[in-house]
From Swiss-Prot:
The protein's name: Dihydroxy-acid dehydratase
Listed EC numbers: 4.2.1.9
List of residues binding [2Fe-2S] cluster: 52, 125, 197
Catalysed transformations (reactions): (2R)-2,3-dihydroxy-3-methylbutanoate = 3-methyl-2-oxobutanoate + H2O; (2R,3R)-2,3-dihydroxy-3-methylpentanoate = (S)-3-methyl-2-oxopentanoate + H2O
Keywords: 2Fe-2S, Amino-acid biosynthesis, Branched-chain amino acid biosynthesis, Iron, Iron-sulfur, Lyase, Magnesium, Metal-binding
Presence of keyword Lyase: yes
Record note on quaternary structure: Homodimer.
Co-factor: note: Binds 1 [2Fe-2S] cluster per subunit. This cluster acts as a Lewis acid cofactor.
Name of the gene: ilvD
Pathway: Amino-acid biosynthesis; L-isoleucine biosynthesis; L-isoleucine from 2-oxobutanoate: step 3/4; Amino-acid biosynthesis; L-valine biosynthesis; L-valine from pyruvate: step 3/4
Record-annotated active site: 474 (proton acceptor)
Length: 560
């Protein structure tokens, strides 16, 4: 008996009582033969106003062509996106993290309302990646991700530059390290075309995680946006989704606990973004896999940082692809017993089978260090707890900034206040900069602090100050930084009670973050604290404040 591949779409196309549905489909130029084909949603996060996303419509057409060669019916649709790079440092960043959940909601909505049988999702930027994955997990219909791809490095006066060079140019100009003319040249040459930010920032981090999970094709995460290889990846979409339909392989068959462990190992080795903690927690929630921030610490305790990527290192993703790409790194880790090779992937094969014929990394490469010569012996993503963060926080400690910082609190109730303080010389060596009321509810939207960290680095204070916040950090942030502090200030967490001059210790060796205050003093301050007014009174941000969970549970919006 022939297997039914259109088991969802036939609800509309073959049921005589759905005449109006069929009339509208005929009106889209479908014919009689099309009515019996499996319908594949092709969900692109295309929009013109961002280098990460500007080319995705073209990729979606390549995917549609590939799907239809396999006697399937491709149905393209778009969802929204927010460019962190464009909105960074403004109130627009409040909309960034919540766009992840809106993307998941909208893809789930279109796929469910229109009864599509499978999904090929095409994200390009930071929050696009987990948003598409959360939708795949919720729907649990055959599907996979095609990453829009990474950007090529910019070049200025013979030297490679990227988006973080542009962010740091303002601080460098303020401190006299570069001229205004050099700043202008930097921002005009940092982004040479389509593709996601080139270092191990959030988009590339999540692309690596998705490939390690088995939810994208091999090499997807390291192939550049404008390469022939990215077109070839799109050309494989039809046979890939048809195979998934025929074998009835669904996301929950692939996104298992062991697969998430593979993802956590790879992003640790790669030196990935702190945002991966939030996003992997949210992705795991979408498939009912029990994952917690403590699991990240367990992985960090036994996994080294090997990749020398920007922002703290030298290289970008295009450099890695030139020497073998992400699969070559995974093959090295598999040989070392650090990955679960028996995990199923969207090829229909196991991870180990996918990697069997992948070439090894060159012995003399300088991008990926050998296991016996790591950049850092343990993971850079450290989960810190203590009286400042009883429910946890996430530190990004590469080792270059040290592992212990003791200093005095310099407290700001917004990102803007802190930026003004740096500009006027009110941030000094030895400060623990505290930026609060920037959490999921308080921000709202838990905005990223790339502007403050870039300003600190550009001003030459990167080795001399620490920054803690209930907000997030961009994948482009580096320095001695601790984010995701929970409970957040808006909910009366300890970060709301800190005052200028408080002595704070950040210890990434023992995983603690404490303020030197007695329980009596803390209780006294707590009794005086009053909740602040919601920053959003209408619309999507108000709904987000009411539904979002804490950073330690992934900032998801569909928990009970």
């Amino acid at each position: 008996m022939k297997k039914v591949l259109n088991k969802y779409s036939r609800r509309l196309t073959e049921d005589k009582s759905q005449g109006a549905s069929q009339a509208m489909l005929y009106g889209t130029e479908m014919n009689d033969a099309d009515m019996h084909k499996p319908q594949i949603g092709i969900g692109s996060v295309w929009y013109e106003g961002n280098t990460c996303n500007m080319h995705l419509n073209q990729l979606a057409q390549f995917v549609k062509d590939s799907v239809e060669k396999e006697n399937l019916k491709g149905m393209r649709f778009n969802t929204i996106g927010v460019s962190d790079g464009i909105s960074m440092g403004t109130d627009g960043m409040s909309y960034s993290l919540q766009s992840r959940d809106l993307i998941a909601d909208s893809i789930e909505t279109v796929m469910s309302a229109h009864w599509y049988d499978g999904l090929v999702s095409i994200p390009g930027c930071d929050k696009n990646m987990p948003g598409c994955m959360m939708a795949l997990g919720r729907l649990n219909r055959p599907g996979f991700v095609i990453y829009g791809g990474t950007i090529q490095a910019g070049v200025m006066r013979g030297k490679p530059i990227d988006i973080v060079t542009a962010f740091q140019s303002y601080g460098a100009c303020l401190s006299g390290q570069i001229t205004e003319q050099e700043r202008q040249e930097t921002i005009k040459k940092a982004c040479p075309g389509a593709g996601a930010c080139g270092g191990m920032y959030t988009a590339n981090t999540m692309a690596c995680a998705i490939e390690a999970l088995g939810m994208s094709l091999p090499f997807s995460s390291s192939t550049s946006a404008t390469s022939v290889e990215k077109v070839q990846e799109c050309d494989k979409a039809g046979e890939t989704i048809k195979n998934l339909l025929e074998l009835d392989i669904k996301p929950r068959d692939i996104m298992t606990r062991k697969a998430f462990e593979n993802a956590m190992v790879l992003i640790t080795v790669m030196g990935g973004s702190t945002n991966a903690v939030l996003h992997l927690l949210a992705m795991a929630s979408s498939v009912d896999v029990d994952l917690s921030i403590d699991d990240f610490q367990e992985i960090a305790n036994k996994t080294p940082v090997l990749a020398d990527f920007k922002p703290s290192g030298k290289y970008v993703m295009a450099n890695l692809h030139a020497i073998g790409g992400t699969p070559a790194v995974m093959k090295m880790l598999l040989k070392a017993g650090m990955l679960h090779g028996d995990c199923l992937t969207v090829t229909g094969k196991t991870l180990a089978e996918n990697l069997e014929n992948v070439a090894d990394l060159p012995e003399d490469n300088t991008i990926i260090h050998k296991l016996d010569n790591p950049i850092k012996k343990t993971g850079h993503l450290q989960i810190l707890k203590g009286n400042v963060a009883p429910e946890g926080s996430v530190a990004k400690i590469t080792g270059k900034e040290g592992e212990i910082f003791e200093g005095v609190a310099n407290v700001f109730d917004s990102e803007e206040e802190m930026v003004a303080a740096v500009e006027t010389g009110k941030v000094k060596k030895g400060d623990v900069i505290v930026i609060r009321y920037e959490g999921p509810k308080g921000g709202p939207g838990m905005p990223e602090m790339l502007k403050p960290t870039s300003l600190i680095m550009g001003a030459g204070l990167g080795q001399d100050v620490a920054l803690i916040t209930d907000g997030r950090f961009s994948g482009g942030s580096h320095g001695f930084i601790v984010g995701h502090i929970t409970p957040e200030a808006y909910e009366g967490g300890m970060i709301a009670l800190l005052e200028n001059g408080d002595k704070i210790t950040i210890d990434a060796i023992n995983n603690v973050i404490n303020v030197d205050l007695s329980d009596q003093e803390i209780a006294q301050r707590k009794s005086k604290w009053r909740a602040s007014k919601q920053k959003a009174s209408r619309g999507t941000l108000k709904k987000y404040i009411k539904t979002v969970s804490s950073a330690s549970t992934g900032c998801v919006t569909d928990l009970d």
